[in-house]
Amino acid sequence: MPPSNDDLEGARIMVKLDDLLYARRMTLTELADRVGLTLANLSILKTGKAKAIRFSTLAAICRELDCQPGDLLGYKAD
């Protein structure tokens, strides 16, 4: 049985997009253009406010940043 929302309270997925962009010397605007997302949607992801991400979006970001999903996302339990 999957964990309930109560079991996950305090746990969160961390998005490490800032670190990857800095390492690649790429702006958020440039990445948005390359992956076909609006700057607003990519900003929501970058700030950790996104509730979900499509695999196709994740794949496009990883393609452009030359990284693996685990380089972009992390899990933190409280």
Model segments located where?
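A short, Lys/Arg-rich alpha-helix, primarily the initiator
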Residues: 1-27
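DNA major-groove recognition helix of helix-turn-helix
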Residues: 46, 57, 76
